[in-house]
C-alpha cells in the first residue's frame, strides 16, 4: 500500500509483520507487532514515536506491506525469516559468524588430544568433551599452551599419528609422550589426560601443588633452568585462570546483553559467564537501526542463538522483552530463562555489559561518532557510503611488494572481506603503477560487491590516477578520496592532512579534531597495518625458501633455530656447536659448513 493511499482503517488489529519499502520497492525495514494497527499508528502520529531515526525512516518509505499471522510466535519467526531474505538496511542483521572458541577432547580416538575448535563445529554425533566457550581466542590458546607445556599430550592430526615411524621434535622438547611410536603405555597417557581434564574443569589446586613440588625439587638439584621453566608455566596457569574467576555467579551459565545507542550507531555487547567464570565480551555494531530496543533485542537473540549449539540456562536483557514466546522458540525442550533483573548480581552483570558497550563505542570511533553528516555537509555527497574500500601497499626497496584493500561497512571493519594482491617486482618502482595494478585486478571480476567509496593513501596525483582508472572501467557511483600529509607545512609541530575528492579536486585541510579527518585516518591506518602484516608474511616466506638446504628437513631446521634463534646465527656457528645438535649427521654438518662459506662471501 502506497503511503499516499495509506489508511489505518484498512489495517487489522491482529498480530503480524509489516514491511516498509522505498520508491524502488526495496525493503528498508521489517517489524513485528502484537497489534498491527496500533504499531503502525505510532509512525504517523507526531507524538507516537519519539525515536530520532523514525522521521528519517519515514521520509524514505514509499509503501507499507502488512502480513497477518495467527499469533505472536508466528510473527516472531516470520519477521526473522523475512529479515534474512530481504536484508533490510535498518534492521539488525548478523553476518555469518565464526562463533566462539572451545577446547575439545575427542573420545572416539584411542589416544585423545586437546584441540581448539569453533562452537559451530560441535556436533551431537561426535563423542567429545567440550570446555568453554572462550570468547577470546587468546584465552583459548593460552590454555592450549599451558596444556602443551605441562601435560605432554599429542597435538598431531590423526593421519600424521598413524603414519609416524619415529617421534617428532615435541618428544625431544618433552611436550609429547610419543604414543605414536609406543613410547608410553595407555595407562600413562590416560593419567596425563585425566590431569589435563581436571585442569580444564578449573580444578587447578592439585596441578599447582604438583608444579610447586617439581620447582622445589629442581631447585634442590641445582637445575635452575628447568625450575625457571616450570615457574613460568605456573605463572601462566594462575594468570589464565585468575582472569576468569567470578565467584558471584555461583557456577551459573549466563549471557548478559548490554545495549548502547549514540546518534545513528547502536552497540550490542554480549557478556558470557560459564561455570561462574566471566569468559569475556563480544561486540556487535549496527548503523541506522530503526528497531525499538525490545525489538532489537528479540531479533538479535533469535538470530544469534538459533545458530548456537549451546544456549545458556539464563539470558539477561536490559529491558523486559515484549514476546514471552521467544524463550520457547529458542529451545522447546529446555527453554532458557529470559529476565531483566533490577537488583542483585544479575543487575551488576547487566551494568557491566552496558559499560562495555559504551567503552567499545568510545574506543572504536572518534570521540563523538562516525561522520555521517560530514559526508553530506563537507564532501557534499547525496547519500552515505555504506561500503568503503581503502587501498594501500607495502614493499622493501621494491621487493616482496604487496597491495591490499580493507572493507568498512555498516557494522565497522569486515576482515573477512579484506584482500591481498602479490605484485611483480617490475611494477614496484612506480607507486602509481602499483596502485593501477591493484585496482585493475580488484575490478577485473565484478562478483564482489562494488564500493560506494574508495579511499587511497596519497595526494592529488593518486586522486587523479584513481579517478581515471574508475572512469576507464566505466564504473559509476563510486566516490574517490585520497588523504596525504602536507609537505613542509607544520602547525604546532604536527603535519597537516590534505584530503582530495570530487568536490575538492585541489584538496582541502580539516582541523585535527574533525571527525571526518579522524575517520579517514582510521581507515588509512587499518589499511597500512594490514599491508605491512601481509608484506612481512610474504617476505618471511621468501626468507624461508632461502633457508632450504638439501638434506636439512623441517625437524632439523627447527632444532637449529631453537638453538641459534636465527638463521644468521646458524651461518655463524662453529663445527663444534653444530655437532652438539641432536639428529645432525656428519653429512648434514658438512653441507651447513659449505653453505656458511657462501653466506660469508655474500655478506
Curated annotation (Swiss-Prot):
UniProt-listed GO biological process terms: nucleotide-excision repair; SOS response
Coiled-coil residues: none
4Fe-4S in keyword set: no
Main subcellular location of this protein, as a coarse class: cytoplasm
Intracellular or extracellular location(s): Cytoplasm
Pfam families to which the protein is assigned, alphabetical: GIY-YIG, UvrC_RNaseH, UvrC_RNaseH_dom
Key words of the record: Cytoplasm, DNA damage, DNA excision, DNA repair, Excision nuclease, SOS response
Residues in UVR domain copies: 205-240
GO molecular function: DNA binding; excinuclease ABC activity
Cellular component annotations (GO), alphabetically ordered: cytoplasm; excinuclease repair complex
Domain GIY-YIG: 13-92
Keyword tRNA processing applies: no
InterPro entries associated with the record: GIY-YIG_endonuc, GIY-YIG_endonuc_sf, GIY-YIG_UvrC_Cho, RuvA_2-like, UVR_dom, UVR_dom_sf, UvrABC_protein_C, UvrC
Source domain of life: Bacteria
Function: The UvrABC repair system catalyzes the recognition and processing of DNA lesions. UvrC both incises the 5' and 3' sides of the lesion. The N-terminal half is responsible for the 3' incision and the C-terminal half is responsible for the 5' incision.
Family recorded in the similarity comment: Belongs to the UvrC family.
PANTHER family for this protein: UVRABC SYSTEM PROTEIN C, UVRC/OXIDOREDUCTASE
Quaternary data: Interacts with UvrB in an incision complex.
Protein's recorded name: UvrABC system protein C
Organism per entry: Chlamydia pneumoniae (Chlamydophila pneumoniae)
Taxonomic lineage of the native organism: Bacteria, Pseudomonadati, Chlamydiota, Chlamydiia, Chlamydiales
Amino acid at each position: 500500500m502506497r503511503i499516499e493511499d495509506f489508511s489505518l482503517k484498512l489495517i487489522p488489529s491482529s498480530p503480524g509483520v509489516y514491511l516498509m519499502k522505498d520508491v524502488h520497492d526495496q525493503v528498508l525495514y521489517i517489524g513485528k507487532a502484537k497489534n498491527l494497527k496500533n504499531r503502525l499508528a505510532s509512525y504517523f502520529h507526531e507524538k507516537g514515536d519519539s525515536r530520532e531515526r523514525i522521521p528519517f525512516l519515514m521520509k524514505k518509505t514509499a509503501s507499507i506491506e502488512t502480513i497477518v499471522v495467527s499469533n505472536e510466535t508466528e510473527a516472531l519467526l516470520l519477521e526473522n525469516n523475512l529479515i534474512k531474505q530481504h536484508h533490510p538496511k535498518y534492521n539488525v542483521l548478523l553476518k555469518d559468524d565464526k562463533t566462539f572458541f572451545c577446547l575439545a577432547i575427542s573420545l572416539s580416538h584411542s589416544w585423545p588430544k586437546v584441540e581448539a575448535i569453533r562452537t559451530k563445529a560441535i556436533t551431537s554425533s561426535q563423542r567429545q568433551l567440550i570446555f568453554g566457550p572462550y570468547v577470546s581466542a587468546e584465552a583459548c590458546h593460552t590454555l592450549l599452551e599451558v596444556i602443551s607445556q605441562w601435560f605432554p599430550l599429542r597435538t598431531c592430526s590423526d593421519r600424521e599419528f598413524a603414519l609416524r615411524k619415529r617421534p617428532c621434535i615435541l618428544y625431544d622438547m618433552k611436550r609429547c609422550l610419543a604414543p605414536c611410536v609406543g613410547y608410553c603405555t595407555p595407562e600413562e597417557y590416560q593419567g596425563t589426560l585425566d590431569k589435563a581434564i581436571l585442569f580444564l574443569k578449573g580444578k587447578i589446586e592439585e596441578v599447582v601443588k604438583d608444579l610447586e613440588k617439581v620447582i622445589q625439587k629442581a631447585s634442590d638439584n641445582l637445575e635452575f633452568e628447568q625450575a625457571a621453566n616450570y615457574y613460568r608455566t605456573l605463572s601462566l596457569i594462575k594468570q589464565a585462570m585468575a582472569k576468569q574467576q567470578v565467584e558471584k555467579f555461583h557456577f551459573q551459565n549466563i549471557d548478559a546483553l548490554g545495549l548502547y545507542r549514540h546518534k545513528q550507531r547502536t552497540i550490542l555487547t554480549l557478556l558470557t559467564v560459564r561455570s561462574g567464570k566471566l569468559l569475556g565480551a563480544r561486540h556487535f555494531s549496527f548503523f541506522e537501526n530503526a528497531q525499538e530496543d525490545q525489538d532489537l533485542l528479540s531479533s538479535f537473540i533469535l538470530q544469534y542463538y538459533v545458530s548456537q549449539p549451546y544456549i545458556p540456562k539464563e539470558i539477561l536483557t536490559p529491558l523486559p522483552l515484549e514476546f514471552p514466546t521467544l524463550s520457547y522458540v529458542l529451545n522447546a525442550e529446555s527453554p532458557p530463562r529470559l529476565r531483566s533483573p533490577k537488583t542483585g548480581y544479575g543487575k551488576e552483570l547487566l551494568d557491566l555489559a552496558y559499560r562495555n558497550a559504551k567503552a567499545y563505542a568510545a574506543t572504536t570511533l572518534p570521540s563523538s561518532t562516525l561522520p555521517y553528516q560530514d559526508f553530506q555537509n563537507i564532501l557534499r555527497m547525496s547519500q552515505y557510503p555504506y561500503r568503503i574500500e581503502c587501498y594501500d601497499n607495502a614493499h622493501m626497496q621494491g621487493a616482496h611488494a604487496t597491495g591490499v584493500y580493507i572493507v568498512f561497512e555498516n557494522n565497522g571493519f569486515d576482515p573477512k572481506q579484506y584482500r591481498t594482491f602479490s605484485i611483480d617486482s617490475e611494477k614496484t618502482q612506480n607507486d602509481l603503477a602499483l596502485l593501477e595494478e591493484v585496482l585493475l585486478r580488484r575490478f577485473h571480476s565484478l562478483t564482489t560487491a562494488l564500493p560506494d567509496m574508495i579511499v587511497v593513501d596519497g595526494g592529488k596525483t593518486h586522486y587523479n590516477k584513481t579517478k581515471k582508472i574508475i572512469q576507464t572501467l566505466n564504473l559509476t557511483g563510486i566516490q574517490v578520496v585520497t588523504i596525504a600529509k602536507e609537505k613542509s607545512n607544520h602547525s604546532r609541530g604536527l603535519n597537516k592532512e590534505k584530503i582530495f575528492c570530487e568536490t575538492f579536486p585541489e584538496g582541502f585541510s580539516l582541523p585535527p579534531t574533525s571527525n571526518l579527518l579522524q575517520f579517514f585516518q582510521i581507515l588509512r591506518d587499518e589499511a597500512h597495518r594490514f599491508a605491512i602484516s601481509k608484506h612481512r608474511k610474504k617476505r618471511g616466506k621468501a626468507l624461508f625458501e632461502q633457508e632450504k638446504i638439501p638434506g636439512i628437513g623441517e625437524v632439523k631446521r627447527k632444532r637449529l633455530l631453537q638453538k641459534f634463534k636465527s638463521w644468521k646465527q646458524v651461518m655463524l656457528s662453529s663445527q663444534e656447536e653444530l655437532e652438539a645438535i641432536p639428529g645432525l649427521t656428519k653429512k648434514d654438518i658438512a653441507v651447513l659448513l659449505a653453505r656458511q662459506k657462501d653466506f660469508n662471501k655474500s655478506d
